[in-house]
């Protein structure tokens, strides 16, 4: 199986998984599991809030946009070839994740956890936008850096995974999202990153 087909399969699988989970969030089983996680995290929140605020930073627009720009700039400066092969995939990772998670939220208007609602966070919960955005940019950036020969997969893959997991966990720790929102965010980010990686292959 070539790279394009493998990426297409991964992206389609992630997208289908995200939609399936969106439907599943309406079921009693998933809601019960989400409440169980929230019940366990709630008493820990005062102690982990500071670490969670740091962990969530990579999902902020002021972080993932510059991160994508830094990856693109590194590729352009270090390697020959069209700059668009880096600019388009990295820009699409940020913008694509934002557009997709907002589109899904418009369809599945899921309420946030009580903690978030009490703090005025009333926009739909599923999927976690911070998690989706960070995952898309991190995964796309890691893929491009490896394909360009600028970083070994043994280094960038663990770093990207660790940061992506930290962002997702922080959204639950801060009380902004249910655990299934975060899983949906990871799946959304993977789906978007797969499309961006395919675009890179076509532009290279």
Task: Report residues per predicted region.
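Alpha-helical transmembrane segments of integral membrane proteins
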Residues: 5, 9-10, 67, 84-93, ...
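Short hydrophobic alpha-helical membrane-entry/anchor segments
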Residues: 18-30, 76-81, 106, 169-170, ...
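Membrane-water interface at transmembrane helix exits
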Residues: 25, 38, 42, 72, ...
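Membrane-helix interface segments
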Residues: 47-48, 62, 81-86, 113-114, ...
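Interfacial segments of alpha-helical transmembrane regions
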Residues: 73-97
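Alpha-helical transmembrane segments in multi-pass membrane proteins
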Residues: 89-93, 97, 101, 185, ...
């Amino acid at each position: 199986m070539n790279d394009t087909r493998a990426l297409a399969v991964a992206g389609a699988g992630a997208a289908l998984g995200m939609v399936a989970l969106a439907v599943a969030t309406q079921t009693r089983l998933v809601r019960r599991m989400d409440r169980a996680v929230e019940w366990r995290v709630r008493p820990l929140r005062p102690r982990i809030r500071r670490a969670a605020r740091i962990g969530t930073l990579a999902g902020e627009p002021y972080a993932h946009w510059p991160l994508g720009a830094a990856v693109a700039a590194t590729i352009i400066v270090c390697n020959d070839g069209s700059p668009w092969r880096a600019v388009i995939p990295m820009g699409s990772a940020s913008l694509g994740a934002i557009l997709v998670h907002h589109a899904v939220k418009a369809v599945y208007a899921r309420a946030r956890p009580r903690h978030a609602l009490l703090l005025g966070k009333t926009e739909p919960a599923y999927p976690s936008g911070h998690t989706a955005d960070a995952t898309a940019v991190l995964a796309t950036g890691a893929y491009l850096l490896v394909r360009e020969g600028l970083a070994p997969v043994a280094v960038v893959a663990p770093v990207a995974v660790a940061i992506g997991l930290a962002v997702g966990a922080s959204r639950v720790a801060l009380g902004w999202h249910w655990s299934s929102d975060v899983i949906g965010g990871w799946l959304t980010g993977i789906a978007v990153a797969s499309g961006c990686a395919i675009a890179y292959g076509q532009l290279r």
